[in-house]
Design a protein with these regions (language model features):
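Conserved small/polar residues in nucleotide/adenosyl-binding loops
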Residues: 183-185
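Cofactor-pocket helix-loop regions in the catalytic cores of large enzyme subunits
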Residues: 1-180
Length: 185
């Protein structure tokens, strides 16, 4: 599902950032993963960025995990509501004009279609579906928008669903909206 979702969004089915990119991140967003237990080496890299760059760590997971215990912002959402969560975050990004307009203009095709879909996911609707309060969504969106370059990490918790392809595409669209994709720091 990752390869198909990324290929459909970016045009090729591969991830973009390395551990060295993570070291230079000013914000870190993790969804569908628990590096503390599943990828301890990657957690060391995340913690290095958190400590050296004062990078806020945002962890989105239905369960409070060992990784979530390290988070500056833990977002508990209903299982399977990843797309609604991401669209809710993007609603705040577009509503507050936090998107990277120049990056979108130069490198992104179809963001107007994404924007039209995201308009349906205001704070009330997103909270109804995900269980996440609109105030927390706005806070998380603002953290990611104000701390660039950032890192967005997803793992099999988001991809191993019947809607995993949709999750992956939403994750990619979020990165494109903020200009986080394809940035080599």
């Amino acid at each position: 599902t990752t390869v198909a979702g990324v290929a459909n969004t970016w045009g090729y089915g591969a991830m973009t950032n390395s551990y060295n990119d993570i070291h230079n991140s000013k914000a870190i967003f993790v969804i569908g993963g628990n590096p503390a237990e599943a990828h301890p080496v990657s957690l060391m890299h995340l913690m290095k960025a958190k400590e050296q760059n004062n990078a806020p760590l945002i962890v989105c997971d239905p369960r409070f995990t060992r990784t979530a215990a390290h988070a500056d912002e833990y977002v508990r959402f209903r299982p399977g509501s990843d797309v609604a969560l991401i669209w809710g975050l993007m609603w705040h990004i577009f509503e507050n004009k936090w998107e990277d307009k120049e990056f979108i203009r130069q490198r992104v095709y179809g963001m107007d279609d994404v924007r039209a879909e995201v308009k349906k996911w205001g704070p009330e609707e997103t909270e109804r579906v995900t269980g996440v309060p609109g105030s927390q969504l706005k806070r998380v969106a603002k953290i990611m928008a104000n701390n660039r370059p950032g890192t967005f990490i997803w793992c099999m918790g988001g991809t191993q669903h019947t809607n995993g392809n949709n999750n992956t595409r939403a994750y990619c669209a979020f990165q494109l909206a903020l200009g986080l994709s394809l940035i080599h720091i």
